[in-house]
């Protein structure tokens, strides 16, 4: 159980964009119509687009976005958000490049692979989450004979998809604890996070690497037991999720982007300091497929931290660790996804 995991309250001043947005929204809320200048962002011109198609991972990694959506922060900026849960990162990224989505929120590993391997024109516009203790871990069942990471040798460790961030985090922690990755079996096919606990309980996999809220749900429903926290060593406080647009979309929608970021930054700040806000936002989503979390899970699930802006040095950790574990053929400079 994660009843002992407490949300970490951080005292931090509002970022300049968020502060400006809050002040402007207080004086101008409710005055914007379609095509109007964003009331909260102080945009210098009309919004190029007021209805955005946004695909985001339905997990606690996206809490800042869900808070902004729940609290009407995008609406205050003159934006209507059409939200789609991003179940498969590869599918969503390909659809985004094809124009189906304006902005997506997903794991950095998948985005970097698409840029490094397929030269997709993707730009990181904001950070979404950093891993915190308890927010991702490896689990077994209560009667499992596996009691340590070393005992995973020869066993099947369930991950969301081959070569994605779920694999990378597990690989980093296993290696740090002296486990040869060649001695651990991984599924050849993806296992959706909502199905992973059931696979574990049915004995189809011997252990499972799961993020929140799926981890706490597995504990509540099946009695799953934490074997190892993934927040350690090379993966400690690891950047997990970011928000991305194509380079052409960023260039063609500067005012819309500014409005989106103003709302998102407010959501990030609230999520980072108010556990109650995160619980309420995720409890009221339309269904489990969209990220809805029942109150019994929301009350005890561990949360990430939710940074503001983009930190190049911090994000460079992701491709560096990817290269170390063979997910990139050569070193990758994250600056090419930041416009620098």
PLM features: what roles do these ranges have?
Residues 1-49:
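Short, low-complexity disordered leader/linker segments with a strong preference
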Residues 35-183, 188-190, 206-212, 227, ...:
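Short, glycine-/small- and polar/acidic-enriched structural segments
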Residues 59, 86-90, 105, 164-165, ...:
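Soluble non-cytosolic domains of exported or imported proteins
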Residues 109, 118, 186-187, 192-283:
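Pocket-lining segment of extracytoplasmic ligand-binding domains
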Residues 154, 220, 339:
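Phosphate-coordinating loops and pocket residues in cytosolic domains that bind phosphorylated ligands
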Residues 250-327:
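Secondary-structure end/capping motifs
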Residues 320-340:
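Conserved C-terminal helix/tail region of periplasmic/extracytoplasmic solute-binding proteins
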């Amino acid at each position: 159980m994660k009843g002992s995991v407490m949300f970490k309250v951080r005292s931090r001043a509002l970022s300049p964009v968020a502060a400006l947005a809050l002040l402007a929204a207080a004086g101008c809320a409710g005055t914007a119509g379609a095509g109007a200048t964003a009331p909260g962002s102080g945009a210098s011109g009309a919004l190029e687009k007021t209805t955005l198609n946004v695909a985001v991972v339905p997990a606690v990694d996206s809490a800042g976005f869900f808070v902004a959506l729940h609290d009407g922060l995008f609406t205050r900026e003159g934006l209507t958000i059409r939200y789609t849960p991003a179940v498969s990162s590869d599918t969503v990224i390909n659809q985004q490049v094809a124009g189906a989505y304006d902005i997506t929120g997903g794991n950095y590993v998948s985005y970097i692979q698409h840029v490094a391997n397929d030269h997709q024109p993707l730009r990181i516009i904001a950070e979404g989450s950093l891993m915190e203790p308890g927010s991702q871990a490896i689990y077994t069942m209560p009667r499992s004979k596996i009691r340590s990471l070393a005992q995973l040798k020869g066993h099947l460790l369930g991950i969301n998809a081959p070569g994605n961030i779920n694999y990378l985090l597990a690989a980093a922690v296993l290696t740090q604890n002296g486990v040869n990755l060649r001695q651990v079996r991984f599924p050849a096919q993806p296992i959706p996070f909502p199905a992973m606990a059931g696979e574990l309980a049915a004995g189809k996999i011997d252990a499972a690497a799961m993020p929140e809220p799926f981890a706490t749900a597995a504990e509540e429903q099946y009695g799953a037991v934490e074997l190892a926290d993934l927040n350690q060593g090379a993966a400690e406080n690891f950047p997990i999720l970011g928000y991305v647009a194509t380079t052409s979309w960023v260039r063609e929608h500067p005012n819309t982007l500014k409005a989106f970021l103003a709302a998102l930054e407010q959501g990030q700040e609230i999520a980072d300091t108010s556990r109650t806000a995160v619980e309420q936002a995720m409890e009221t989503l339309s269904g489990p497929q969209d990220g809805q979390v029942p109150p019994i899970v929301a009350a005890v699930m561990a949360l990430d931290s939710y940074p503001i802006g983009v930190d190049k040095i911090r994000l460079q950790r992701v491709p560096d660790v990817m290269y170390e574990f063979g997910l990139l053929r050569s070193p990758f400079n994250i600056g090419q996804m930041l416009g620098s």
